[in-house]
């Protein structure tokens, strides 16, 4: 099924054959000042070979969504709702089963590759360790497979690089190592948390192209967590726009980009710098994201919204206003454009 066809399929039907189904996901942290709800009743689904972009400002709950799915929440975190992977519930799995799942079927690329790699071990040893532990390969087999995967992520002189330490690599090269490590066990789902944040724009483009190629080659589903809408436009099939832990808008990437139906989505898109806007004032969203301990009454975006109305003091329901698209706003979508 193509991306365009997916956009017109009702969400219930999309969920029926999805690889990952997330329903009413809720993440709460206990703090000395009270409970903080970082993720509030999140719903989405993802098929094999699809890429979902989760976008929003810092503090919107993007990374905590990923950590919840990976079982990596901080000790003071609590999780609720449901997440099924290949029909199996994965939230609150026993540690042993969770480790097996993370190693073999779900992998994650973290934001800073330098802190994700062991500085005291050669890169090759770190790659081989994954295969020897989870695929029961011999040292020689693991070495050759690691070289093949480094070749797959376009690492120049892959065999030579196996003997090098992380500090001998550039930022872009280290990120390629992390992608190779994440794909060694051929996972069905790859979660990428701001994988290009610390990289220059040229390397960003190379990493995005690489992820697209690997998605096609291995039919891997990808969750791309980012605040960079340019990244989303280049790789994602579907987009989930988050604010204060909640879904503001969800749908096909083309629709969200060209026909956004939530003031927050429109604000994010308007804030993207344009090459043809020389001399024009850069647009921003006024104000700051809310304190999650003291959320405004009703819609959390209300204090910053240029279209706020009296009714916005009540929380807008998240509705499927057309097949495959969700929005949480009282203002009619056609009046926002």
PLM regions with names:
Residues 71-72, 188-195, 199-280:
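P-loop NTP-binding/switch modules centered on Walker-like glycine-rich loops
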Residues 76, 90-107, 125, 133, ...:
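ABC ATPase NBD coupling module
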Residues 103, 167, 185, 209, ...:
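Conserved signature/switch motifs of ABC ATPase nucleotide-binding domains
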Residues 88-89, 141-160, 269-270:
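Conserved ABC ATPase "signature" region
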Residues 12-18, 156-160, 250-337:
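Short catalytic/signature loops enriched in Gly
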Residues 15-19, 28-41, 72-78, 94-97, ...:
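A short, flexible loop at the N-terminus of ABC-type nucleotide-binding domains that lies
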Residues 79-89:
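Conserved ABC transporter NBD signature motif
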């Amino acid at each position: 099924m193509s991306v365009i066809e997916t956009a017109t399929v009702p969400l219930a039907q999309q969920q029926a054959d999805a690889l990952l189904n997330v329903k009413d996901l809720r993440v709460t942290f206990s703090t000395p000042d009270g409970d903080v709800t970082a993720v509030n009743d999140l719903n989405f689904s993802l098929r094999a070979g699809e890429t979902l972009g989760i976008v929003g400002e810092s503090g919107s709950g993007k990374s905590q969504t990923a950590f919840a799915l990976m079982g990596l929440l901080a000790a003071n975190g609590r999780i609720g709702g449901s997440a099924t992977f290949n029909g199996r519930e994965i939230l609150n799995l026993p540690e042993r089963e969770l480790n097996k799942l993370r190693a073999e079927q779900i992998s994650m690329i973290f934001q800073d590759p330098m802190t994700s790699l062991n500085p005291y071990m050669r890169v090759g040893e770190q790659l081989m360790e994954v295969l020897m532990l989870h695929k029961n390969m011999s040292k020689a087999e693991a070495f050759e497979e690691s070289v093949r995967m480094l070749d797959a992520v376009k690492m120049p002189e892959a065999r030579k690089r196996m003997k090098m330490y992380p500090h001998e690599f550039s930022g872009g090269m280290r990120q390629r190592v992390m992608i190779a490590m994440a794909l060694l066990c051929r996972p069905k789902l790859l979660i990428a948390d701001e994988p290009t944040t610390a990289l220059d724009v040229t390397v960003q483009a190379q990493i995005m192209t690489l992820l697209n190629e690997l998605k096609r080659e291995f039919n891997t589903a990808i969750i791309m967590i980012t605040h960079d809408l340019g990244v989303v436009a280049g790789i994602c099939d579907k987009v989930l726009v988050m604010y204060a832990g909640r879904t503001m808008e969800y749908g096909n990437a083309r629709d969200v980009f060209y026909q956004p139906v939530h003031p927050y989505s429109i604000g994010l898109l308007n804030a993207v710098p344009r090459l043809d806007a020389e001399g024009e004032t850069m647009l921003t969203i006024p104000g700051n994201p809310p304190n999650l301990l003291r959320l405004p009454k009703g819609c959390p975006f209300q204090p910053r919204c240029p279209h706020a109305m009296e009714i916005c003091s009540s929380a807008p329901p998240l509705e499927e206003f057309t097949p495959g698209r969700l929005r949480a706003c009282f203002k009619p979508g056609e009046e926002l454009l």
